[in-house]
Amino acid sequence: MGSVLGLCSVASWIPCLCGSAPCLLCRCCPSGNNSTVTRLIYALFLLVGVCVACVMLIPGMEEQLNKIPGFCENEKGVVPCNILVGYKAVYRLCFGLAMFYLLLSLLMIKVKSSSDPRAAVHNGFWFFKFATAVAIIIGAFFIPEGTFTTVWFYVGMAGAFCFILIQLVLLIDFAHSWNESWVEKMEEGNSRCWYAALLSATALNYLLSLVAVVLFFVYYTHPASCAENKAFISVNMLLCIGASVMSILPKIQESQPRSGLLQSSVITVYTMYLTWSAMTNEPETNCNPSLLSIIGFNTTRPIPKDGQSVQWWHPQGIIGLVLFLLCVFYSSIRTSNNSQVNKLTLTSDESTLIEDGNGRSDGSLDDGDGIHRAVDNERDGVTYSYSFFHFMLFLASLYIMMTLTNWYRYEPSREMKSQWTAVWVKISSSWIGLVLYVWTLVAPLVLTNRDFD
């Protein structure tokens, strides 16, 4: 009897696996918009992929991965292939994820509303999409080595560079929303309390940035060497100071009264993180001490024969993963009314979203029977670009690939080590990010004939 009931329970989920996104979460989540629930499920798809990729790097997994035909055949290098098989597995898994999201991105080009037949694919058929993703990933493991890893390294680097810029755009959006929320509460009442909170958050961000700069000069520079690190730290520090001063200039404040030091402090902290992340990828070990070696720990796995050690745990990678998760889930639930950021992320503003509880039509949030529903808030027009959202997840897959492998370039005939290319990608992204932030400040002054409200 219990087996029959269990089978019936499983069978009740079959329509959900082929139906829309809200059906999957309606039993365990509160009511919400269809557009938000769909993005959350795609983000969970990516999170599962990240977890599996992390498992691939666990010491001891190489014995299982070596069973895949052709994975380590006829490869001789400084580092034995069986030690680096986890890195190769991450490349193939992320390749499969990236191709899955790129396929969806191309399929969803110019979808304008949920009445488009392609929108049903975006918002439903979850079992088939999951099966497709798994099939692509499994197929990727049988791709001959050849130049695959080398070519995909450069593709991953370009994609990760773009995703870092998207992270910064979302960070700017978050900083603007944070500042606007606290300023509104400060104006409504209890102004001293909220003013103190605003001042404390800003001061904390700048204090963290100052401490980071001091530590960078202490541990990542030497009096007679590490000229590149000295230049990176100094230039980014001066650029952050310049952006902070610019944010409080009278002309900027006149055109954007809500701009201020809180946003600048958040951008400054992120810029310092990118600076540190870039320096940790330098090939010269004397200018690139690992964080754990600084505090007296070691996480390298020694290789029994002649060869180099392989570090399995990278602090900068952990921080990168945390920022990645925050970015992806924030992009899934955000309903920003910042018009400049919305134009960059191809998202409609908050006013286009159907408010919860408006009407009791076929797509109402609650049918009165206590069952959670989700409103179809995209019948008249999508609230975000389906194609761009999937393209962002495509870039996110590449960013994860580069982060988990610490931006190493793998070649069987050479050592597994950092590349200057990775350093310049991260440093240039920090500069472009600062330029984007400054542009959000000066755009209303430069383009006077456009409305930025």
From Swiss-Prot:
Lumenal topological domain residue ranges: 61-88, 145-151, 219-231, 281-309, 409-426
UniProt note on tissues of expression: Highly expressed in the neuronal populations such as Purkinje cells in the cerebellum, brainstem and spinal motor neurons, locus coeruleus and raphe nuclei.
This protein's UniProt keywords: Endoplasmic reticulum, Lipid biosynthesis, Lipid metabolism, Lipoprotein, Membrane, Myristate, Phospholipid biosynthesis, Phospholipid metabolism, Phosphoprotein, Transmembrane, Transmembrane helix
Lipid linkage positions (N-myristoyl glycine): 2
Protein localization: Endoplasmic reticulum membrane
GO biological process, one term: phospholipid biosynthetic process
Transmembrane helix as UniProt keyword: yes
Residues annotated as transmembrane: 40-60, 89-109, 124-144, 152-172, 198-218, 232-252, 260-280, 310-330, 388-408, 427-447
Modified residues annotated as Phosphothreonine in this record: 352
Any GO MF annotation of the entry: acetyltransferase activator activity
Residue numbers carrying Phosphoserine: 351, 361, 364
GO-annotated cellular components: endoplasmic reticulum membrane; plasma membrane
Cytoplasmic-facing ranges: 2-39, 110-123, 173-197, 253-259, 331-387, 448-453
Membrane topology: Multi-pass membrane protein
Role, per record: Enhances the incorporation of serine into phosphatidylserine and sphingolipids.
Subunit text: Interacts with SPTLC1.
PANTHER family: SERINE INCORPORATOR (PTHR10383), SERINE INCORPORATOR 1 (PTHR10383:SF15)
UniProt similarity note: Belongs to the TDE1 family.
Protein name: Serine incorporator 1
Species of the source: Mus musculus
Name of encoding gene: Serinc1
